[in-house]
Regions:
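N-terminal helix initiation/capping motif
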Residues: 1-37, 103, 107-118
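Short, surface-exposed secondary-structure edge patches
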Residues: 8, 43-49, 78
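Short coil-to-beta-strand transition motifs
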Residues: 10-12, 26-27, 60-70
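Short conserved beta-strand and strand-loop elements enriched in small hydrophobics
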Residues: 16-21, 52-66
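A residue-level detector for short acidic-glycine micro-motifs
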Residues: 21, 34, 75-77, 93
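Short beta-strand-centered aromatic/proline hotspots
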Residues: 30, 69-76
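Short, well-ordered beta-strand segments in soluble/periplasmic domains
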Residues: 40-44, 55-58
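Short, solvent-exposed secondary-structure boundary/capping segments
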Residues: 41-44, 79-91
Length: 118
């Protein structure tokens, strides 16, 4: 993975996410491991090489419409002793509506974290 080039804080959260590979078509349903304004880390039973274009459907709250985001893999690694991969996915295109929803959600997490450490 190399040096940490993250520009925004990440939060350890576990949310359902669907990864749609555009070419060739493939669908993986999994969970996030962490989330930031710029991307997500998740697990996958399928490998997605670096620069694979993906469409993500990310559910932040049960019963809410998922965020639909375009992204691409920036790294992947094999999970030791398993048949899974960890994926790092950077968001490419986020609508203004979904940016607002993601920003509100991450701000809430940040405030909760700050208040719990006092």
């Amino acid at each position: 993975m190399g040096a940490d080039r993250r520009r925004t804080p990440r939060f350890r959260v576990y949310h359902p996410v669907r990864l749609h590979r555009l070419r060739p078509t493939q669908l993986v349903e999994t969970l996030t491991k962490d989330l930031s304004f710029g991307g997500v880390r998740c697990m996958s039973t399928a490998t997605f090489p670096i620069s694979t274009e993906l469409q993500l459907e990310l559910v932040l709250f049960a019963g809410e419409e998922p965020l639909t985001l375009a992204g691409h893999t920036v790294w992947f690694q094999v999970v030791p002793y398993g048949e899974q991969y960890e994926l790092g996915i950077a968001f490419d295109e986020v609508s203004a509506h979904h940016k607002r929803r993601l920003s509100i959600y991450l701000d809430t997490l940040s405030r909760q974290l700050a208040s719990s450490s006092v």
